Every structure is written in C-alpha cells, then in structure tokens.
Amino acid sequence: MLHTEGHALLRAVGQGKLRLARLLLEGGAYVNEGDAQGETALMAACRARYDDPQNKARMVRYLLEQGADPNIADRLGRTALMHACAGGGGAAVASLLLAHGADPSVRDHAGASALVHALDRGDRETLATLLDACKAKGTEVIIITTDTSPSGTKKTRQYLNSPPSPGVEDPAPAPPSPGVCTSPSEVQLQTAGGGRGLLSPRAQEEEEKRDVFEFPLPKSPDDPSPSEPLPKPPRHPPKPLKRLNSEPWGLVAPPQPVPPAEGRPGLERLAAEFNGLTLTGRPRLSRRHSTEGPEDPPPWAEKVTGGGPLSRRNTAPEAQESGLPSGLRQKLSRMESVELDTPGHFCPDSPESSRLSLERRRYSASPLTLPPAGSVSSPRQSQESLPGAVSPLSGRRRSPGLLERRGSGTLLLDHISQTRPGFLPPLNVSPHPPIPDIRPQPGGRAPSLPAPPHSGAPGSPRTKRKLVRRHSMQTEQIRLLGGFQSLGGPGEPGR
C-alpha cells in the first residue's frame, strides 16, 4: 500500500521513530497535516505509548520546535493538550504544550476541558500543572468535582468559582471543604473508587453533598419576609394632557369617576357599577366646510337662494318665456324696456321697438340661426344675431340700475345713418335731420362731436344711473366712420 508523506509522518511519530520523523520533515513533510479524523503528528505523539516516557517528551519537543500548533482540534474538538491529559502523557508533556501556547480552558464538543480529562485520568501532577497555568494567566481557580450518575458511570463537573459579593453574610459557617483554593496543593481529589467503597451509602451521600458547592443567592439586608405583605406604592393621579392637532373624534370628555359604592345595598352598588361603564355625553361638534347638518345658512346664502331662476344665454327658447308667471313676465319686460330706453334706443311704446324685440328673441333663441340672405337688417340687429352677441335674456342678469354704453361713436353713427336711407334703415322719427359738419377744420382742430341728448331732467333718477363701458369703439363703427370722413372731405369726389 502506498502512503503519502503525511501519513508516513504520523506512523513514524506513533511508533516513536524520531530519526525517521526528522528525515520526513527535512524532506518537506507538513508538520500540521492531519488525517481523515483531523489528527495531527503532535496529537499522535501525545497519545502514543512509548517504552521510555522520556522519548515522548523528546518527540513532542521536536515537533513543537518544527512549528506544530498545539491548539489545532480534531473532529471531536480535542486538542493535543486534551489528548496528553487523557492518554497519560504526564506533567512534562503538559508543561511543554503550555509553554508553547496551549490553552487549558478550551473545551471539546462534549464540553470537557483538559482539566476534566486530567481529573478523569486521576493524574494529580498534570492537574496541578494545569491549575498553575490558569492562575498564571489570571483565570479564576476552577473547582472540579466527580459524581456518579444513577447509571453507575462517572460524571465530572466543572465550576467556575467566583468570590462572593460584598455585603453577603453566610448564616452558617462553611464546611472545611475547599471553598476557595489559594494554591493547587489545597485541592483534594476524590474519585468514585478508593475509600468511598468502605463507607455506608448514607455516608457516601453526605460526602457527595459536601463535595458539591452551593453558592447561595445574595439577599439584601432589608429584604422583608415573605409573610409580610409588600406595601403598595402610592399612585398619583394622572396629569391632564393637552391634545394638539387631534382628530375631532378624540375630543371626548373623560368619564367622571364613580364614587365608591361601599356601604350601599347590593342592588345600588351593582347599579352604580353599571352606570360607571356608561359613556358620558359627547359635546356637539361644529361642522366646518360641510353642507350637512341643521345649522342655519349664512345671510349671503339667503340672498342667493331668494332670487329667481337664472336665465340662459343665447340658448333660451321662446317657449320657456311664454311659460313664465305673469308677474315675472311683467318685471322682465319692464327691465328690457328700461335697458332699451337709453340714448340712441327706441321708446318702449313705439312699434319699431316691439318689432326689434321680436326679432331679437327670434335670433337669440339659437346661436346658430341667422336671418335670411334677402332680408335687410340694421348693424345692431346683425351684431346681436351673432353667436358671440349678448342676447336680451342675458341682459336680465344685470341689475336694472346699471346701463351699458357699447361705444363712444354710437350717437354719431346713428345721426349719420339717419341721412342715408339706402345704407341703413331709419332709426329716428324725423325723416330728414341735418347732416353734421364732420369735415376737418382749416385751423387743424378736430371736429366737435354733438353731445348726447339727455333723456330726462337733471334731477331724474334715469340720469343718475351708472353707465358701464365695455369698450371704446367697435371695428365696424370705426370703418364706417372712416368711410364717412372720406366722403365728407373738401373735394367731395364721391358726390
């Protein structure tokens, strides 16, 4: 069978052949190489049984000098120090391993350290060496006790002895067993065999109880006895809290505390308890930004709702107007007559005004209807028949105290159009009014325009009404005015 160098090194170390192991290491073998179980050459040297104990110490020293690591663990978690303690390597081998950095506090997968393995082996010298190493590293002294399990096997336990806290008084003096070990020489080792077999079972139980140390839990000196009831701390009333930006449903009045029902009969006490569970009345919450609820509407809402139905613009059919009440119809006709009774408009009693109002109603019923091509109408009628024009129905929305003035040149164009019956229909009762002189003056001054006639006395309420101007002049009126100025020039080529 062919063996690799690692396995050859393990076989050479296991058989105690130091010279062969030296040749293998000098030939390039790795000192920390392990087999399938994770066992290294150093572990094999600690477990081996040599005829001469000095050969084991010499082999371990040589491997450590070649760089072997004493803290490498195998598949079971055991190190070379554990193998030395369990295999009876002796105190010399343990000292060599500890001198090269072996840790005595490391535990294997079963939870046993090198101290436990040394105690199971019963090697006092090795155990003392391990305790000295723990003390040199500043580790607390470890107390180990051996106990027999109910099945009859030995079971070793390891405890960490910590000094008692200050202020704790022992009620009874401690037994002469080693409570706190000051040196390894004071540690008493006891195993399951030996003198225990000569004692009675009851004496063995007492001795086992004495070996296992029990550390009482610290108690405060002013700790009251369990028979005395603990006084309840005083409960302070809860502080009133102030809600900031809370929800409306959280603004509920806190329930009033119910007085104690002591001294009352059974039924009254039960009724008081049930009454304490009822919720108190909630305050009425005011609604903001909501149209629901029985609250009174604001005064401006009464003014809005108090008015009549709103008229539609350019889409109101004539049938709807005929279906209005007689009182509302008279009011609307009065408002229309007041609007039409402005400077440049007809009198409400004239036949021309009634004919014009009928034409306005017919053309304003639909924004897309236009007069026939053969009919001749005035510019004002053609303007109001357009979709963008304002129908007389839309004028009813305005207050009767506000009158409109559509342009600054309206009166002048009306007077000019009165003298040209072939261009526009007559708008005045007088058939032949004089043509105003609109030619430019020789001095360069602008021609003076006639002032609009007053429709009433200075003190009449009609003259005090406010005139609303939408725009100064319309494009059609400006074009007509420019044409008349060219016709009324000094040469008068058009005549």
UniProtKB/Swiss-Prot annotation:
Q: State the organism's lineage.
A: Eukaryota, Metazoa, Chordata, Craniata, Vertebrata
Keywords linked to the UniProt accession: ANK repeat, Methylation, Phosphoprotein, Repeat
Instruction: Give the top-rank taxon of the lineage listed in the UniProt record for this protein.
Output: Eukaryota
Positions where Phosphothreonine occurs in the chain: 315
Q: Write the protein's name.
A: Ankyrin repeat domain-containing protein 34A
Q: Where is the composition biased (Basic and acidic residues)?
A: 203-213
Q: Does the keyword Phosphoprotein apply?
A: yes
What organism, scientifically named, is this protein from?
Rattus norvegicus (Rat)
- Annotated region Disordered: the residues are 147-495
Task: Give the N5-methylglutamine positions (modified residues).
Answer: 15
ANK repeats sit at: 4-33, 37-72, 76-106, 110-139
Q: After translation, how is this protein modified?
A: Methylated at Gln-15 by N6AMT1.
| Listed Polar residues bias regions | 147-162, 180-191, 375-385
Gene3D superfamilies under this entry? Ankyrin repeat-containing domain (1.25.40.20)
Key word Repeat present in the record?
yes
Ranges of Pro residues compositional bias? 223-232
What family classification does the UniProt entry report for this protein?
Belongs to the ANKRD34 family.
**Where in the sequence does UniProt note compositional bias of the Basic residues kind?**
233-242, 462-472
Q: What residue spans carry the Gly residues bias annotation?
A: 485-495
Q: Which cysteines are joined by disulfide bonds?
A: none
